[in-house]
């Protein structure tokens, strides 16, 4: 049975609109990942956005529970039901039907569509929800309905907001396999398995904890697809179902082991984590040192450790990830489209960790011999595994689990505090809804007229201070936010900065508009007050001329993404952008730096579309129709039922709410000024067009004239070659080795930069001069940084050291344990590379 399709078709027949799975990275600062089906409807439930035209919804939502409040990572592989990535089937009512219909729908689907026997089904309800008990008694004997407390059967979104009792459907898997003391309905055993949770959102909890009935109660339900699949196949473990069979077969082939062997938990960990890695990479999450990228890294490294237990000492996970991409190609087309990029990025991350995995395992195994009688693992060693060898703490604890031990958390935290604190993203976020509730209740969304005009007459609805508390009037030299009845100012969004401009009254300027932002559907402009204004004043709102330059750069960004996909492949997707009046910045998914030929092709393609003078076309259509037309959409964006589509004939088509030029010819010209790395798997292009393009051409022409003068040669290339020959001749003389040498614990440490000379030869000379050495020498040449490093009788491998430092330069190193070299084109990161080189060496020496 195709459970997903069966579920969605069932609820579509019951009048529900079917919604696609939203991205795993939600447009919600309070969440690390999308962890439930209701996440994409959160703003509807809280009243921030209006109810959709069809107030019933159904979805099959991909969810991630690793990191953050909901973290199942440590349990995966050791239990029958835990996953990092899973699909949640759900039906929702936004003030339409309530308990009676929700219970009826659930019972019908479970017994008729899924075919579960009514005699095997049990129900839990909240202890005070007598209404639900009466409704369930129509289908289930009262002795199979159990009342439970708030802990088990009361759901709330946060400390305040919508909440209500819930009711769960359980299935009895039979006493044949479950005979423990806790295997009774309501016990902690696995015999009675929850399959569906129905949440009855009927209350609003105030900040002081008081519950008030909601005027329009709602429904939110969730049922795990993997769990249902296993039950239908009479499997006692989710991983034993056909959903995971292709992955188990691949792992068995790679390891030459049987799934039913002692390594079964490791099979399950690798299978689960391969799914998570595939979907996260395909949806634009990349390996990183913080936030979501670090969770992704932890998942991969945990999988590699379990592969290591099964004898896999080389990269392997990328092969299992490839199977995931093929398995889900029909239901999630983007996995197939991005398979090459996903597999490549996974392989490179594996290679990086495998360089330190074996050394880290040696330290771990050695330290196990010194466990104290309480089986507490030294926190300092746990920190060294984390800091030097890249072992996340949960990975170390996972390894300790099989030895009945755990890490000294206090000791680990002390080491962490002593280290220089890296900036960390706080994914908990702020509950801003309460700050705006009064404004949302008082004002309807203001009208945006900026697509049609850059100037309009408008009434001042209100002024607000920096905390968005309403104030009655605005006086000279104040900075305040204003809400206009209608506004021509475009609010920051889609990477484009907010409009600036001015307000006029009685033919005089009364305020400068510094910025424009949208909060919960309201467009606010930040003002610098020149003359006193009060609520109710009628003003003329005028957008500044820089709007046109922003529009040029915004349209150029669309053409750029299209060109990148044509040159590099369809795996390219937007990872971030900034659109200003004098430049654009575009971040995109791609595993390696673009070479000169690729950059030239991209630039030529964009300019070719500019010179074609293509007219822009703006259409409004249903989201599914837009996607069918091939419109590009952001994974991180949450779209409405109807969307705005901007296209430039065959050159580009995207979902976009921004301001654009009417014709590509108005962009003028396009130049890429820089290409660099942002993080693993994410590249950045910076470019200019319009007036900024012309200004750059003027400056470069001026520099060219100056170069001719300095070289005393109208042929600049010939003049440079002559100068290079002169420099080359001067370098034939021996180069002095004026590099700083520090002696630490008997080892000579050399980290520095030279302007000329053969750095490989310098390393050789240093090695011959010193008995114990750690040396890394950098040199700028041909718009790149090259480095060479040598190790002699010191506790670090040259190839590991060089490769780690090279990554910050956008490159990769290679070599042996005693000598290695590397290079990269991110010249601006030289100082950071020097710092990393020295700190890595110091850690190795101090260890």
Swiss-Prot record:
Documented EC number(s): 6.1.1.7
Annotated binding of Zn(2+), by residue: 554, 558, 656, 660
Gene Ontology MF annotations: alanine-tRNA ligase activity; aminoacyl-tRNA deacylase activity; ATP binding; tRNA binding; zinc ion binding
Cellular component per GO, a single term: cytosol
Keyword Ion transport: no
InterPro entries linked to this entry: aa-tRNA-synth_II/BPL/LPL, Ala-tRNA-lgiase_IIc, Ala-tRNA-ligase_IIc_anticod-bd, Ala-tRNA-synth_IIc_core, Ala-tRNA-synth_IIc_N, Ala-tRNA_ligase, Ala_tRNA_ligase_euk/bac, DHHA1_dom
Alphabetical list of CDD domains matching this protein: AlaRS_core
Gene3D superfamilies: 2.40.30.130, 3.10.310.40, 3.30.54.20, Bira Bifunctional Protein, Domain 2, Threonyl-trna Synthetase, Chain A, domain 2
Note describing how the cofactor binds: Binds 1 zinc ion per subunit.
Cofactor(s) of this protein: Zn(2+)
Subcellular localization: Cytoplasm
Keyword set, alphabetical order: Aminoacyl-tRNA synthetase, ATP-binding, Cytoplasm, Ligase, Metal-binding, Nucleotide-binding, Protein biosynthesis, RNA-binding, tRNA-binding, Zinc
Tagged with keyword Protein biosynthesis: yes
Any one Pfam family match given in the protein's UniProt record, by short name: tRNA-synt_2c
Gene Ontology biological process terms, A to Z: alanyl-tRNA aminoacylation; negative regulation of DNA-templated transcription
Major location category of this protein: cytoplasm
Reaction catalysed by this enzyme: tRNA(Ala) + L-alanine + ATP = L-alanyl-tRNA(Ala) + AMP + diphosphate
Role noted for this protein: Catalyzes the attachment of alanine to tRNA(Ala) in a two-step reaction: alanine is first activated by ATP to form Ala-AMP and then transferred to the acceptor end of tRNA(Ala). Also edits incorrectly charged Ser-tRNA(Ala) and Gly-tRNA(Ala) via its editing domain.
PANTHER family documented for this protein: ALANINE--TRNA LIGASE, CYTOPLASMIC (PTHR11777:SF9), ALANYL-TRNA SYNTHETASE (PTHR11777)
Matches recorded under NCBIfam families: alaS
Domain remarks in the Swiss-Prot or TrEMBL record: Consists of three domains; the N-terminal catalytic domain, the editing domain and the C-terminal C-Ala domain. The editing domain removes incorrectly charged amino acids, while the C-Ala domain, along with tRNA(Ala), serves as a bridge to cooperatively bring together the editing and aminoacylation centers thus stimulating deacylation of misacylated tRNAs.
Family: Belongs to the class-II aminoacyl-tRNA synthetase family.
Protein name: Alanine--tRNA ligase
Annotated source species: Helicobacter pylori (strain ATCC 700392 / 26695) (Campylobacter pylori)
Gene: alaS
């Amino acid at each position: 049975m195709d459970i997903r399709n069966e579920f969605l078709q069932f609820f579509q027949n019951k009048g529900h609109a079917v919604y696609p799975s939203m991205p795993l990275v939600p447009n919600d600062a309070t969440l690390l990942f999308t962890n439930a089906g209701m996440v994409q409807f959160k703003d509807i439930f809280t009243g921030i956005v209006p109810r959709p035209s069809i107030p019933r919804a159904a979805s099959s939502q991909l969810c991630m529970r690793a990191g953050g409040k909901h973290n199942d990572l440590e349990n995966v592989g050791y239990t029958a039901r835990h996953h990092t990535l899973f699909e949640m089937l759900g039906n929702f009512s936004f003030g339409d039907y309530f308990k009676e219909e929700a219970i009826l729908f659930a019972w019908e689907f479970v017994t008729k569509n899924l075919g579960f026997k009514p005699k095997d089904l049990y129900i839990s309800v909240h202890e005070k929800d007598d209404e639900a008990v009466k409704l369930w008694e129509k289908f289930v004997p009262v002795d199979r309905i159990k009342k439970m407390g708030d802990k088990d059967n009361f759901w709330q979104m946060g400390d305040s907001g919508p909440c209500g009792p819930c009711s769960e459907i359980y299935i009895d898997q039979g006493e044949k396999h479950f005979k423990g003391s806790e295997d009774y309905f309501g016990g902690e055993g696995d015999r009675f398995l929850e399959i569906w949770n129905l949440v009855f959102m009927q209350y609003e909890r105030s900040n002081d904890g008081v519950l008030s009935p909601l005027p329009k109660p709602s429904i939110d339900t969730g049922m795990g697809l993997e769990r249902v699949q296993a039950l239908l196949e009479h499997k006692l473990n989710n991983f034993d179902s056909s959903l995971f069979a292709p992955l188990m077969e691949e792992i068995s082939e790679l390891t030459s082991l049987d799934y039913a062997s002692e390594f079964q938990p490791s099979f399950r960990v690798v299978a689960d984590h391969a799914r998570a890695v595939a979907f996260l990479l395909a949806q634009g999450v990349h390996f990183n040192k913080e936030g979501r990228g670090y969770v992704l890294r932890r998942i991969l490294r945990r999988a590699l450790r379990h592969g290591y237990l099964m004898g896999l000492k080389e990269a392997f996970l990328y092969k299992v990830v490839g199977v995931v991409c093929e398995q889900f190609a029909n239901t999630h087309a983007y996995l197939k489209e991005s398979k090459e990029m996903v597999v490549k990025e996974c392989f490179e991350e594996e290679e990086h960790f495998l360089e330190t995995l074996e050394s880290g395992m040696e330290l771990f195994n050695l330290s196990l011999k010194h466990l104290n009688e309480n089986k507490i693992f030294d926190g300092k060693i746990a920190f060294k595994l984390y800091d030097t060898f890249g072992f996340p703490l949960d990975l170390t604890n996972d390894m300790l689990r099989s030895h009945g031990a755990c890490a000294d958390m206090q000791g680990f935290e002390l080491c962490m505090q002593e280290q220089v604190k890296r900036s960390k993203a706080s994914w908990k976020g702020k509950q801003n809804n309460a700050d705006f509730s009064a404004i949302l209740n008082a004002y309807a969304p203001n009208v945006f007229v900026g697509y049609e005009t850059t100037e309009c007459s408008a009434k001042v609805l209100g002024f607000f201070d920096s905390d968005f508390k309403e104030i009655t009037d605005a006086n000279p030299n104040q900075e305040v936010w204003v809400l206009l009845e209608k506004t021509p100012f475009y609010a920051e969004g889609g990477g484009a900065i907010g409009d600036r401009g001015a307000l006029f009254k009685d033919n005089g300027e009364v305020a400068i508009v510094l910025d424009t932002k949208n909060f919960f559907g309201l467009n606010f402009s930040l003002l610098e007050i020149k003359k006193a204004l009060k609520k109710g004043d009628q003003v003329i709102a005028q957008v500044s001329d820089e709007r046109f330059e922003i529009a040029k750069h915004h349209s150029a960004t669309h053409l750029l993404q299209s060109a990148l996909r044509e040159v590099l492949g369809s795996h390219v997707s937007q990872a971030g952008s900034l659109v200003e009046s004098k430049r654009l910045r575009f971040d995109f998914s791609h595993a390696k730096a673009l070479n000169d030929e690729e950059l030239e092709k991209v630039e030529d393609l964009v300019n070719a579309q500019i010179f074609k003078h293509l007219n822009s076309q703006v259409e409004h259509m249903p989201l599914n129709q837009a996607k069918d037309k091939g419109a590009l959409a952001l994974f991180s964006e949450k779209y409405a039922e109807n969307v705005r589509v901007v296209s430039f004939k065959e050159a580009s088509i995207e979902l976009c709410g921004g301001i654009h030029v009417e014709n590509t010819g108005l962009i003028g010209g396009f130049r890429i000024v820089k290409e660099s790395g942002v993080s693993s798997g994410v590249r950045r292009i910076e470019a200019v067009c319009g007036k900024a393009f012309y200004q750059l051409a003027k400056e470069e022409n001026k520099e060219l004239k100056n170069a001719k003068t300095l070289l005393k040669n109208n042929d600049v290339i010939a003049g440079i070659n002559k100068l290079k020959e002169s420099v080359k001749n001067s370098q034939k003389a021996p180069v002095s080795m004026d590099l700083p040498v520090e002696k630490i614990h008997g080892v000579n440490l050399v980290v520095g930069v030279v302007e000329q000379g053969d750095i490989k030869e310098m390393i050789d000379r240093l090695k011959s001069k010193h008995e114990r050495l750690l040396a890394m020498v950098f040199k700028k040449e041909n718009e790149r940084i090259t480095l060479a490093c040598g190790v002699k009788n010191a506790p670090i491998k040259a190839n590991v050291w060089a490769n780690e430092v090279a990554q910050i330069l956008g490159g990769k190193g290679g070599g042996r344990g005693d000598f290695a070299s590397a290079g990269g084109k991110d010249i601006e990161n030289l100082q950071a590379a020097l710092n990393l080189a020295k700190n890595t060496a110091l850690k190795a020496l101090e260890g």
